[in-house]
Amino acid sequence: MALAPHSNFLANHETIKYYVGSKLPGHKRFSWGWEDYFGSIVVAKICSSRRIPRYFRKSPRICCGLDSRGLQLFSHGKHNLSPAHSINQNVPKGNSGCKFPKDVALMVWEKWGQFAKTAIVAIFILSVASKADAVDALKTCTCLLKECRLELAKCISNPACAANVACLQTCNNRPDETECQIKCGDLFENSVVDEFNECAVSRKKCVPRKSDVGDFPVPDPSVLVQKFDMKDFSGKWFITRGLNPTFDAFDCQLHEFHTEENKLVGNLSWRIRTPDGGFFTRSAVQKFVQDPKYPGILYNHDNEYLLYQDDWYILSSKVENSPEDYIFVYYKGRNDAWDGYGGSVLYTRSAVLPESIIPELQTAAQKVGRDFNTFIKTDNTCGPEPPLVERLEKKVEEGERTIIKEVEEIEEEVEKVRDKEVTLFSKLFEGFKELQRDEENFLRELSKEEMDVLDGLKMEATEVEKLFGRALPIRKLR
């Protein structure tokens, strides 16, 4: 059991201080189901002040906070994009605590009152949205509270789902924010997250759909292979190159295909790297049908989860039962959360890309406006997971290298500043000596009569003061 302290601020300057603890079994890795979860305790303390900020007076009942981009998405690959939400509500003063057993969801929502609202705020609170996003944020949060209460309660009580939300907070305002959110989903995917997504995104449509921005246009059928037999896809294939770093560049992507009832069935597996240097394996089953008019197009539709649809376009292929066999796929997809994601992958029989087929691939990639040289090389060694001690040592070494690098960068900056200062002082000193030389030359060139006139013009400050009757401040002459 581990307790983590947290503190959040509500709309009316109420402060929630809470501790969340979870007891997890040690024999499983990121596989928290209801049967695995023993218990969790949330202790919440609310402190209230009398003054209510003007910003929240317009919505006295429900105040929803999101980050500057509004509602965030988190995904478990290109098909499973899901929402993370934060909810602020005005909560009365008091202390409340609760223990979550297996039937936590029913218990929480039967007693939907002070604790339930407090727990949601404690887990899902984010920064307040900008004024432009405030209306949409309020609609989303209101929809969740009204339509997805049960699913929300289950997410709160599930360690993986709660960890997913916490992970998302590290993505705010990053240049790779979307990619970061999707990686969070990859790490913490489970059935509870899926159930919440199904309600919030698909069934009740609380989450606005991300629009297609045209990054992956549909290719013209003329640039695709004109003949393709789905049976050629049968057997095991490795993905050795991928275009999209978010979806296509996982380690150990070994996919096995077979045909049944005029469909191509793919058993897909890949590895997700964990922050400690380990990994765990994900898997999925996908089914494709061939376009009756264009053999180079395969459709993966009619999926229940988020109603996702993937369209595969075969740019080039060579299947001759040799190590140089390959199938080059470009794809575009859509689901209830995101319309227009896409990418491209190269399937090869070999775990490593044969160099001899690269010219063909470069030509094929150019047909859809892509440069094959920019594709990412994947790691298909598929070795065992390193021992925990080795992984920890590696992380320590990485940390040491990071610190050394930062120190070296600081030293370089200090050296640059010092060099600039030395150069500046050197120039000032040279200028001062030049002025001295000018003065000496000037005095040397004066005649005796000119020197006498110059001496006669010299007046003491006290004499000037008397002359002007103390009307001038003497400090300006001294």
UniProtKB/Swiss-Prot annotation:
Domain of life the protein comes from: Eukaryota
Its membrane topology, per UniProt?
Peripheral membrane protein
For this protein, what is the EC number? 1.23.5.1
The coiled-coil segments of this chain are: 388-453
Keyword hit for Membrane: yes
* Enzyme class name: oxidoreductase
* Alphabetical keyword list: Chloroplast, Coiled coil, Membrane, Oxidoreductase, Plastid, Thylakoid, Transit peptide
Q: What is this protein called?
A: Violaxanthin de-epoxidase, chloroplastic
Give the organism's phylogenetic lineage: Eukaryota, Viridiplantae, Streptophyta, Embryophyta, Tracheophyta
Query: Gene that codes for this?
Result: VDE1
